């Protein structure tokens, strides 16, 4: 059971996209990375080929390391930024539940 899962809302802690929020689209456990919607956008220039007669410029979300991400306890508003939190685990009724450390509530 991972601390960050697919469809979780996360905030970027460091790097060019610091402070940006997005939903986790995909996890890559082998690289300890995740693809987050709207974060770490890269562009790729494709040359013309037999299949693709016109060259093109593609934009896509590149993976970002999990160590640079934190789960969002409370979403951002106009007045206040998003509150990042660490994740803990608690066993209730023989089930392992994720807990937000800042709020103490189940995720």
From Swiss-Prot:
Q: Which CDD domains match?
A: KOW_RPL26
Q: Which InterPro entries match?
A: KOW, Rib_uL2_dom2, Ribosomal_uL24, Ribosomal_uL24_CS, Ribosomal_uL24_KOW, Translation_prot_SH3-like_sf
The alphabetical list of record keywords is:
Ribonucleoprotein, Ribosomal protein, RNA-binding, rRNA-binding
- Could you confirm whether the keyword RNA-binding appears in this record? yes
| Pfam families (UniProt xref) | KOW, ribosomal_L24
Mention one GO molecular function: rRNA binding
One biological process term from GO is: translation
Q: Which SUPFAM superfamilies match?
A: Translation proteins SH3-like domain
Q: Among its keywords, does the record have rRNA-binding?
A: yes
Record Gene3D superfamilies? 2.30.30.30
Any one of the GO CC terms: ribosome
Sequence similarity: Belongs to the universal ribosomal protein uL24 family.
Concerning HAMAP family, the annotation shows:
Ribosomal_uL24_B
UniProt-listed NCBIfam families: rplX_bact
Assembly and interaction partners = Part of the 50S ribosomal subunit.
- Function in brief: One of two assembly initiator proteins, it binds directly to the 5'-end of the 23S rRNA, where it nucleates assembly of the 50S subunit. One of the proteins that surrounds the polypeptide exit tunnel on the outside of the subunit.
> By what name is this protein known?
Large ribosomal subunit protein uL24
Q: Which organism is it from?
A: Mesomycoplasma hyopneumoniae (strain 7448) (Mycoplasma hyopneumoniae)
